[in-house]
Amino acid sequence: KGELVVIMIHGWGGGTEAPKPQLELQKALGDVYVVAPLYPRAQIMEKYNIEKDGRAIWNDSWSLNLTVPGTPHDDWRGGGDANGTTMSSYDVVDELLARLSDRALYPNLKKIVLAGYSAGGQFVGRYVAVGKGVVRDGIALEYAAMAPSTYLLPNSTDTWHYGIGNRPRYSRDMSEEQIMGNLRRRRCLHGCGSLDVGEKSLDKTPCAMKQGENRFARYQNFKALVEKDSRWAEKVVFHTFDSIAHEASKAYADPYLLKYMKEVK
């Protein structure tokens, strides 16, 4: 029937091939399109011996040292531009949404879920705040941001993507009121595994460490922040993946998440 589309955003080590949970999610949900845009980094292409062939590449300013931040302006996780371009990682999602909103191509489409895990969860959480999020009437657009290394704290003057200072081109001209307006009207599931307390690929920059010692602690602290704002909390669903560490495939197979993706409010 083509009533559901999931746009799946890969993690920090992805960007050169479809994410591993893509086919598993497609099988679990049944009649669904799963679309997975890629945001490669030069480091990942070198790791897999992939030559630079003209494709867009992000994050040249970010080193392998997880205690040292790069610039937000080339970081795909927060809408930064591909190196040497004015194409934001969020522009790609906007183009996908425009394409999916074409009634002639997808006449039965009722719901789109932008979902991401780990670095993909960072991407989604920030798109909720600043993304255009435009779809045609009759399509519900919802979000699932899972197990991110860090969260956007809209009440913080820290640099993007931890706070709202020094935002990249895509969201530079937005006001704080617009950002909070998006957060208070867009439905998003935030999830994290109860055992996600390891340090693999964990952001350890000073701004990140202020959010907590590990992903699960940061998730709990973010939940407490959201619950202080009743209008924001009304649109947020928090879900703890029981007995799961940092394991994307297990999270995407979680029955609660699958139900969230399928249901149309």
Question: PLM features: residue spans?
Answer:
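Serine-hydrolase catalytic machinery in alpha/beta-hydrolase-like enzymes
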Residues: 3-111, 122
